[in-house]
Amino acid sequence: MRRSIVYAVLTAAAALGGSLAAGQTLPASVPQPVDIRVHVAAGGGFVDDLSLADFDLTEDGRPQPLRSLTLIRSGQINRRQGIDVMVTPPPRTYTLLFQLTDWDPNLSKAVEYLFGSVLRAGDHMTLVTPFKPYHLQSDALSLRTKADLAKAMDETLRKDILRGSGEYRDLVAELSRLSRAISGTAGAAGSREDIESDPTDDADSGFGLETQIDRYRQSLMRMEGIRLVDEAKLLSFAASLKPVPGQKTVILFYQREFRPEINPAAMNRLMSLYQDNPQILANLMDLFQLFKRERKFDADAVKKAFADAGIDFHFIFMEKKSQRVFGATMHEQSEDVYPGFVEMARATGGTSASSTNPAAALKAAAAVSTDYYLLTYLPGAASVPGFRRVDIRLKRPGCQVLSPAGFFVR
């Protein structure tokens, strides 16, 4: 049975967060240093020769003095400057989420790169497939070869994507069949044998068309239900990762989605044929002209929660070609989640990419997550609880700066 990807993520994060101590809670009146992760790039590479004097930090528009700078390269401390600097390298936690309905062979190269160039002994890694989460044992990177681990992950990922997305693919096939029936092309060779026994499937009669439209709506709603992005679970996921110390990298692989629907020519024909039937006209317009997925989560609330938790979130939107379906048109339908995930990446100092090459997109995300400056400062006196926006500006021109949007004062 296919599980909600967000449910699986929440389960994975709870298991990870529960095994790590959050530390002592200090009185709210005592200001504590805040860590800000900053990635600086120029000319396609990381800029590693910056000092405290090169950065300006503002909190809600007010300049704040920086206390320290720590340069992190591939999880190791390369340079320190200032007071109360970091002494030991931060632990690293990676969570990889896969919301895919079809296996893409290019993912194998991404998995090879992950184990060959990113993960190292001591890292925590959780893999979340459409079926369930998996945790990499803490000593696995020390006891097994990276090639063996990459092969095991590749096989698991392939198996779970095919198994966990079976219901989704069945619904796509059902919507394709119904689109052909509604269009009046269901009688073509090879497309009607599965519905021939039902007299109400005659798309040329008003009653049959209404039945087909109703079945299409039901299947569409079932598809919506199994891929629902739940705001509450996203917020809980961020909260569960907040106490986890060190670097917290979350990478979401999301595959482009398509919905089968009747083609424009068939739509025009049906609108003409049933112009005297307002109920059928309304249903046709509702499903095939006006239907649009609305955002299922408040991107502003979720992105602030992820930034506050210290997560660097990376969104990899995997492009794929539209399938050719006789008698139907494949309509792209990722509009409800794409903008929100892009906003989350931007607000956490992460990356977003639309690509047919997941390995290249992963490489770009890994470069941002593994090489960065950790700046610390004391926040201003709290007046009212809420989100404090932190902006980082670089005095050196020609550089791209990625940093989280801020944090909550409670």
List the predicted regions and their residue ranges:
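Positively charged n-region of N-terminal signal peptides that target proteins for export
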Residues: 1-4
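Scaffold/interface architecture of coatomer-like assemblies
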Residues: 22-410
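Bacterial N-terminal signal peptides
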Residues: 7-19
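General helical structural elements
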Residues: 6-7, 41
